[in-house]
Amino acid sequence: KIFEDPTTSYKYSISMTTRHMREGEIDGVDYFFKTKEEFEALIKDDQFIEYAQYVGNYYGTPVQYVKDTMEEGHDVFLEIEVEGAKQVRKKFPDALFIFLAPPSLDDLKERLVGRGTESDEKIQSRVNEA
């Protein structure tokens, strides 16, 4: 709810990914969707604060988006995997990190199934990765 309040300075970062857009998602709102080739070119140009591969897709936080958002006066929150957080920690040692995890792997699987957006195979892959 805090990110929906127009009077707050908090803004949720929009990540970039190579995964396919799900039904109802909007490019530039939910994620910045890129091809694998586009994403890899951005990696070569050092255009990410952090990036990682997860379940066969790239995910990353674009440097320019975060810089622009901060210049607008916002405090930016990133929702990233542990490997990405390690990269951010190296670049920004004073950043505040909060780790959130589901109570159990069964709860994680239940949440993923409840979304209704992924195949059983993809869900199992994500649970195994966790």
UniProtKB/Swiss-Prot annotation:
It comes from Staphylococcus epidermidis. Essential for recycling GMP and indirectly, cGMP. Its main location: cytoplasm. Residues 1-130 form the Guanylate kinase-like domain. Belongs to the guanylate kinase family. Its EC number is 2.7.4.8. Changing K109R: In strain: MCL8544. The keyword Magnesium does not apply. NCBIfam families: guanyl_kin. It catalyses: GMP + ATP = GDP + ADP. GO terms for cellular component: cytosol. This is Guanylate kinase. CDD domains: GMPK. Pfam families: Guanylate_kin.
